[in-house]
Amino acid sequence: MRLKYLKLKNFRGYRDGEITFSDLTAFVVKNDSGKSTILEALDVFFNDSKGVIKYDKEDMNITCGVDDVVISVGFDDLPNEIIIDATNKTTLADEYLLTKDGDLEIVKKFRNGSTTPKVYIYADHPQNPSCCDLLTKKSSDLKKIVKALNLEDVDLTRNAEMRQAIWNHYRDDLNLSESYVDISKEDAKKYWDKISNYLPIYSLFQADRKNSDNDSEVQD
């Protein structure tokens, strides 16, 4: 996957900002304009405060009047397929986990001063109450829905296939809309566990301190 953009809300000096990236990106601005904040926000996102930068509740922009800090990162050049359930292959598009532009946007929200984020995917996802939460359903729950809808020729051993069959049943009434899909809870957490394996490796080297081969970012 390739880093495409970063969105910051209520993080330090950024109330609501977006930065786009290309194969080579350089920031040329005067001092104290927020260059380091961008790089450090990426470190918090990719390394979960286990890298150089540790997220602190004081990173919240207190002038915004809200308690949530949001770091969102968008990616393109996505894997052709992913395996979520055992050996069951699927795609991010088939699971309605992409934006309208076809990007994967992962969102980490630090709520009410918490230093542990909740993880979401901002995607063009079904809003129909009958099929809006299939990603959180266990296999047994999906089977019940398939049987209740009298869907035929569906492999009941494959969660992805059952989800596709249910969504296809409601294909004319999915009510697609870009929304936050919570992948921090229940079975949806498996998506984050798998998707995180495809994320780029991000290492931040700070020029204003001594760097050595023993640093964790070098050893990793």
Which functions belong to the PLM regions below?
Residues 17, 28, 80-82, 115-117, ...:
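Intrinsically disordered, low-complexity acidic/polar segments
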Residues 88-220:
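Electropositive, glycine-dotted interaction segments
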Residues 1-47, 56-66:
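Pre-Walker A-like glycine/lysine-rich segment at the N-terminus of P-loop NTPase domains
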Residues 5-7, 18, 70-74, 105-107:
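Beta-strand secondary-structure signal
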Residues 25, 75-79, 110-114:
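Beta-strand elements of well-folded, non-transmembrane domains
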Residues 40-102:
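Conserved P-loop NTP-binding catalytic core
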Residues 1, 14, 66-70, 99-105, ...:
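A general secondary-structure signal for short beta-strands and their flanking turns/coil
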